[in-house]
UniProtKB/Swiss-Prot annotation:
PTM annotation, UniProt: Phosphorylated by AURKA.
Region Disordered, annotated ranges: 1-27
One GO CC term, this protein: meiotic spindle
Name of the molecule in the record: Protein aurora borealis
Keywords recorded for this protein, A-Z: Cell cycle, Cell division, Mitosis, Phosphoprotein
Name of the gene encoding the protein in the UniProt record: BORA
Sequence positions bearing Phosphothreonine: T354
Organism domain of life: Eukaryota
């Protein structure tokens, strides 16, 4: 019986010695890579036409019709039975079926052409949905979104029933106009706006134009940061009328009243100059002699850098001269803020010629027009330097600064004025330099500087009494800390110090050596070189006086 069964199981091919028929696409270990991706490119399924047709060949279907072959069904049955009994291996077949099932359930049958270009497609979508910012106004930013849709067909293995409600499930996640609700008002919550407009306390700065325009503090604060800004934004301010606050792009946070401008992060070699036109009208601050009549200087080219507390803005720069900048610092001594001592409110005269000082970095002076930086050790008097660059536009005005002096008397303002006019020598003994006699002019305006208690008011160390006789020249002077300004035009400057017209230097205090000289070139420009060696001052109450006389009154309006 065993031999009979064994003979039934053995099926020999029709021709003895013939190689058994095998599937050329299969191998004994093909189950190990059946689940892997076999298609190298989706272009396999594309039908390509050759440019030159080859030789004519009959197709298989045509040959079957032309030359039919008679196949015995018994031969087919025998060969099928042989193939089924010759290679029976349950383990290998199970592995193959498992690999085939894994291939059709987990992997993509045909790779989609969009699969290999995900990064490129994302970049295209990002560029098509970029925001266009209105460059005319950096504050009123308008968000414009170009919503573009691109359809692409790809293969999916997801099967859904006919009555499946896809909108209820994916409706919350699919929003075609999800960026349409972003308005300029909602931009305040973005991180970029917080970096630009938040001050050190974490709140929106008062310099934003969203503040009430009727309040004097917001209006003056807006004017303070108008004239100088360190622009770190790619948005360009085209019109100053549409840019009410260019200081909002300042790299340093703006504090409340006691301002300290930390400009340590400045990397730009040449700060961007501010616009030269301002529609805001400014008002001269009140002093003991100007309380009775208030002047409002209407000038499109000047501003008063004074806030409600009377603090003069240091970040004011003359926009007329760029390469040959005005005086940026009156002394090579650096700035330092002390809490103790008496603070002073002084004025500085700005003349359009270059100040060359030794011991100070020129690039630092160009980048930082006025700032509060630590300086070498000084006395507790709290001496500070502050530069004021204020400009206005008047024509045909003859300005004469008759005296600028420092005294240490404790009397009232009127007594000090009379004492200074009567006894000049006594004032010089008290560390006062008066180099010219007062010029009697019919219409004159006198300002007297008195010490104040505000700890943030600075004082300059270059207070030598120099008289400038200017006729049709471009000159900016600030007789008050509130900075009312009167410039002229042309460039003919005569400097009369009482001794000569070329060398105008004197000893200001006991240990101050100041050497100043003026050189006139063919282009009628002046260069002043100031060398300050030491500065020592007693801790006494000091009153600075400045008399300013005008040959013809400048135009002003009383509110």
């Amino acid at each position: 019986m065993g031999d009979v069964k064994e003979s039934k199981m053995q099926i020999t091919p029709e021709t003895p010695g013939r190689i058994p028929v095998l599937n050329p696409f299969e191998s004994p270990s093909d189950y190990s890579n059946l689940h892997e991706q076999t298609l190298a490119s989706p272009s396999v399924f594309k039908s390509t036409k050759l440019p030159t047709p080859g030789k004519f060949r009959w197709s298989i279907d045509q040959l079957a019709v032309i030359n039919p072959v008679e196949i015995d069904p018994e031969d087919i049955h025998r060969q099928a039975l042989y193939l089924s009994h010759s290679r029976i291996d349950k383990d290998v077949e199970d592995k193959r079926q498992k690999a085939i099932e894994e291939f059709f359930t987990k992997d993509v049958i045909v790779p989609s052409p969009w699969t290999d270009h995900e990064g490129k497609q994302l970049s295209q979508c990002h560029s098509s949905k970029c925001t266009n910012i209105n460059s005319d106004s950096p504050v009123g930013k308008k968000l414009t979104i170009h919503s573009e849709k691109s359809d692409a067909a790809c293969q999916t293995l997801l099967s859904l029933p006919v009555d499946f409600n896809l909108e209820n499930i994916l409706g919350d996640y699919f929003r075609a106009d999800e960026f349409a609700d972003q308005s300029p008002g909602n931009l305040s919550s973005s991180s970029l706006r917080r970096k630009l407009f938040l001050d050190g306390n974490g709140s929106i700065s008062d310099s934003l134009p969203s503040a009430s325009p009727g309040s004097p503090h917001s209006g003056v604060q807006t004017s303070l940061e108008m004239f100088y800004s360190i622009d770190l934004s790619p948005v360009k301010c085209r019109s100053p009328l549409q840019t009410p606050s260019s200081g909002q792009f300042s790299s340093s946070p703006i504090q409340a009243s006691a301002k300290k401008y930390s400009l340590g992060s400045i990397t730009s070699p040449s700060p961007i100059s501010s616009p030269t036109f301002s529609p805001i009208e400014f008002q001269i601050g009140e002093t003991p002699l100007s309380e009775q009549r208030k002047f409002t200087v209407h000038s499109p080219d000047a501003s008063s850098g004074t806030n409600s507390n009377g603090i003069t803005n240091p970040c004011i720069r003359s926009p007329y001269i760029d390469g040959c900048s005005p005086i940026k610092n009156w002394s090579p001594m650096r700035l330092q803020m002390y809490s103790g001592g008496t603070q002073y409110r002084t004025s500085v005269i700005q003349i359009p010629f270059t100040l060359e000082t030794q011991g100070e970095d020129e690039e630092d002076k160009e980048n930082i027009p006025s700032t509060d930086v630590s300086s070498p050790a000084m006395d507790a008097a709290g001496i500070h330097l502050r530069q004021f660059s204020n400009e206005a536009s008047t024509h045909g005005t003859h300005l004469v600064v008759t005296a600028m002096s420092v005294t240490q008397n404790q009397s009232s303002a009127s007594e000090k004025e009379l004492a200074l006019l009567q006894d000049v020598e006594r004032e010089k003994d008290n560390n006062t330099v008066d180099m010219v006699d007062p010029i009697e002019i019919a219409d004159e305006t006198t300002w007297i500087k008195e010490p104040v208690d505000n700890g943030s008011l600075p004082m300059t160390d270059f207070v030598s009494g120099i008289a400038f006789s200017i006729e049709n020249s471009h000159m900016c002077m600030s007789p008050l800390a509130e900075s009312s300004v009167i410039p002229c035009e042309s460039s003919n400057i005569q400097m009369d110090s009482g001794y000569n017209t070329q060398n105008c230097g004197s000893n200001i205090m006991d240990t101050v050596g100041a050497e100043s000289y003026c050189k006139e070139s063919d282009a009628q420009t002046c260069e002043v070189e100031s060398k300050s060696q030491a500065f020592n001052m007693k801790q006494d109450h000091t009153t600075q006086r400045c008399w300013m006389k005008t040959a013809s009154p400048f135009q002003c309006s009383s509110p």
